[in-house]
Design a protein with these regions (language model features):
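Hydrolase catalytic cores
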Residues: 1, 133-198
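Mature extracellular/periplasmic domains of secretome proteins
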Residues: 1, 86-99, 113-129, 148, ...
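Polar, glycine-rich mid-to-C-terminal structural blocks
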Residues: 1-16
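Beta-sandwich interaction modules
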Residues: 16-56, 63-69
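Catalytic-core environment of secreted peptidases
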Residues: 18, 103-155, 191
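N-terminal domain-start motif of subtilase-like serine proteases
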Residues: 38-42, 78-92, 111-114, 209
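C-terminal edge strands of extracellular/lumenal beta-sandwich accessory domains
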Residues: 57-102
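C-terminal domain-closing interface element
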Residues: 195-220
Length: 220
């Protein structure tokens, strides 16, 4: 039994297995009752590890648990029964961030490696999806190569945001535009696939369609 003491750090050594477990308790932020617990395993014995959570008092609430990014793990580590939702990385869950899923534009399917929403407190994330599968881009040396992943989708989304800001700045009487307004403009023009309910945890409000967003904006 490991007691909850905010701000405390506990180390536990399993004598025979020589495995050390470090448990650290934190508050996510001030004026918020959400708690953050770090559990670190050192020299973990191979096998199945089970973590039991027991409330200190009769109350209600949800528990979420995540593994570090795959690049930060050693060996094969995974949950036996995992949930693919609420799996995007920070700062994607921020209130003022623009969160982009990535999908295969040829097959119209979200990539299995794309993080999913919603947030812990049910904010709608991702905002929309952008192409991120086999995206051709410039690399050092004057060459072009294909890239796959959220970084490719983010680059496309950032370019789209820049074009929207440029277009607005050139309109008569333009007063500038905020990042939240740019996000809303993109969301307004998102493309929806038939038979899918939007918003959802994979696509957000749909796929980015910059031409449609600007066309709608032009008609307002």
């Amino acid at each position: 039994m490991i007691p909850i003491r905010l701000g405390y750090l506990f180390d536990f050594l399993f004598t025979f297995e020589r495995t050390t477990i470090t448990v650290e308790y934190r508050l996510l932020q001030r004026n918020n009752d959400a708690q953050l617990v770090f559990i670190r395993f050192q020299n973990a014995v191979p096998g199945i590890w089970k973590i039991d959570i027991k409330p200190a008092m009769q109350t209600t609430g949800d528990f979420h648990i995540w593994l570090p990014m795959e690049e930060f793990l050693e060996g094969e580590v995974y949950f036996l029964e995992s949930n693919p939702d609420t799996t995007f990385t920070e700062p994607s869950g921020g209130r003022n961030t623009m969160t982009v899923a990535f999908y295969n534009s040829r097959e119209n399917g979200v990539d299995i490696n794309s993080g999913r929403g919603y947030t812990r407190d049910e904010k709608i994330k991702p905002d929309y999806a952008a192409p991120g599968e086999a995206v051709t881009g410039a690399v050092p040396g004057g060459e072009f190569k294909n890239r796959t992943g959220s970084s490719a989708a983010t680059a496309i989304a950032a370019g789209g945001c820049a074009l929207i800001m440029e277009w607005i700045s050139e309109q008569p009487g333009a007063r500038g535009v905020s990042s939240s307004q740019v996000r809303n403009i993109i969301v307004m023009g998102t493309q929806k696939l038939p038979g899918i309910e939007y918003p959802n945890t994979q696509w957000g409000y749909g796929t980015m369609n910059l031409y449609r967003s600007l066309d709608i904006l032009r008609q307002l």
